[in-house]
Amino acid sequence: MHARQRNVGNGYRSGSIGMGMSGSRISPERPMRGHGFYGSEHQHRGFNRGYGRGRGRSKSYHNQLPPPLPPPPVQRRSSGGDVFMEAGRLATEYLVSQGVLPQTVLSSKWQNGNFRKQAGEFQSSRSQEEARMDVSAPAAEKRRYIDGYSSAGSRNSLKGRRSHRYDSDFGRSGSWSERSKAFETETGDDSVSGHQEEQPLAEDIASSVQRSASGEFMRKCEGAGDSESVLDKYNLQDEAQSKTGSSSAGKDIVQDCEISKVSEGSSSLSAGSGEMKGRSGGNGGEDENQTAIEDGSIHQRCEDASIDQQCGADESFTKSGIDLATLCKFEKVPTRTRSSLTAKGPKLYLSHNIKDTSHNSGLEEEDQTENRCETRGQSSGKADSTGDENDQVEDFALVQYIENSKCHRSNSFPSSILRDNSEKESGLELPNLHRSHSVGKVGEKRPGEGSDLEEGSKRQRDWVAVSEANERFNMFKTSGNQCDPEEEGKTSSFNKRLIDGAAGKRVSHESLVNNSTYNRTHTGRTGPGYAEEHQLFPASFKMCDLNLGGASDVNDGIKESRQAVDFDLSISSSSKSLEFGTSTRMSNGKEIEVINLDDDQEVVKSSNDPGRKQEAAPYMGIDDVPDYNERLMMVEYLDSFTPINQGTSSVPQNNNTVSLQDREGAIGNDQVPNNTDDDSIFMSLGEIPLTFLQAWDQPPARGYEKPF
């Protein structure tokens, strides 16, 4: 299919030798392949290329052929002026018919852009192309056919499709190299490859200029009349603009660059602005009427003509410090965070509000205009094909104001980002500061309310209070020798009340510890002080003290049910005392012992008494087992290994008197009880005995020898 568009060996086109115009000028659309077209194409290949490139070659091979010589540009230059004159004449007629602007004001680039898109939309279907072929003059067809196959048809249909694909993606953002690369990827299609090989460079430049000049407005222009003049202009305008450098393309490039420079840090905003401009112009160009085209051209001209002035005015407003909030009349108020902060914490927000008054006003204006612009952009983006000319005429002032705000937004974008961040941080931090301030006040009130609790807890950590407790409770030391059992019960109930109280938990226990220590050291084991010790301390301590005194067992059983409530408190507090810090037998709260090492020695001395052992026997089941019992258990455990010691001692004796066989037998006899002892140990530990392993290893070895 591509051979129609290539030079043959003698330098002529295939269509000019003998192919009919109706057969060779069929549009390169895919649905036309099956209508007898492939046969005629193959016939031309075989006729013109007799050296064997016709039948067996694929399209990929034809794409790899070297590009043909470019056509002589003299023919295009001779008629290029006529096309521009015709385009200017049509544009002038439109303007005069409307009477909006004079002939000299309207720039030629919008005329060219409108007619380009009009031609692209006109060539998007096969029926329109066939109608164009019927209207075309034979001389024009001859010239266009020699210059390139369907230079108006394939080229315009290509640009019509490409404008739909890439204009919305690029907008006014993206470099020229990216656009040209995207166009080169587009030219891989079957309907484009031949023409792209003829003029790749001119097509790339012209397509990029055409895309930047026309923008989004070309998407909606559809014109059915004046097709031949439009196509003549559009066919010859690409190379004319690429070689002569027309003022329209140059101005558009300059303005496009200015927009990109103004929006350095906000390419997305500038792209959105470009798309909005294209859409605002394209909404009025949907109808096929001339008035719609005129309105679109007016919008485009006015926006591009005044964009630099608007940017300059915005810069002057920004630099001069004029409050833009006074110029806008919106009903919106600042966000809820700002208003709530002014109501809740006026003192905290006052200084910050004085500093950021200008920032707040600028941000309010920017946020409100951004909301309006986003609303307008969404309406024009979603309903891109539903706008009419009346909306454009009514909203022309709004479009200008939107462009003004967009330019201001993109110009002051970096500073506005900083201000937005500062406002967001202030809006997020100020409520937190207010809350933390209130929490601080609550925290200040709490020490006033519960100061006694904190002082009591701090005294427990600061061990200076122990000496104070010793001095404070000297009365208990002296009264312990003189008080009656009734007074002892009163003191115990008093201490119990102190333990139950929130403020006196630690102090009362320290007093008890010191008092009991004094009673043990001074009054002996059997006396009123010792009885007081048993009454003051809980039952868990008395179980340990039975080994020493064993005097008041009945009182212990009576007091155990009463003071069981304070067991955990006394244990947790006593574990932190200095006296118990020297004890080496504190594994957990239940195993705390009041007995010192010196007391244990006395227990060992008195352990020969059988009656004492019987008294200690009922308490063997509890974790706190006396040391002498543990020693006896260790001795019995060591006595169980006596055969091992005897065996090791008997081995060297047998070495001197017994022969090797007897010695081996003796060793074997020694191993037998050793194995039995090891078996008993391993079975107690839950492991497998060694003798069982020895018997286990032998039978499987015999069994494994059989298959191998």
From Swiss-Prot:
InterPro entries: At4g26450-like (IPR040276)
Biased composition (Basic and acidic residues): 442-461
Compositionally biased spans, kind Low complexity: 260-274
Region of interest (Disordered), ranges: 1-79, 119-301, 349-390, 410-461
Biased composition (Pro residues): 65-74
Polar residues composition bias: residue spans: 238-249, 410-419
Name by which UniProt lists this protein: Uncharacterized protein At4g26450
Organism (species): Arabidopsis thaliana (Mouse-ear cress)
